[in-house]
């Protein structure tokens, strides 16, 4: 299984064609996740895109994706963990200050 980023390029459609094919375009956006740039004259005036993105990987495939996906080198992983711990410490302190104000 390959994990990759899918770039969804919008298709350009003229405003007249959009109006004539409204139902079909909306179905393609909803069911296929397609995007459209609506052109009026020489200008793009609107973009029609799915409101929510659908996951591109099934939950059952996540373990394999993480195992085979990109990894941090040891130095970056160590720095990442330090950054996470610093965020946790500062968040705890901020929460303590808020609680103390209510006591």
UniProtKB/Swiss-Prot annotation:
Keywords annotated in UniProt: Toxin-antitoxin system
Function: Antitoxin component of a type II toxin-antitoxin (TA) system. Upon expression in E.coli neutralizes the effect of cognate toxin VapC1, partially inhibits the RNase activity of VapC1 in vitro.
Protein name in the entry: Antitoxin VapB1
Native source organism of the sequence: Rickettsia felis (strain ATCC VR-1525 / URRWXCal2)
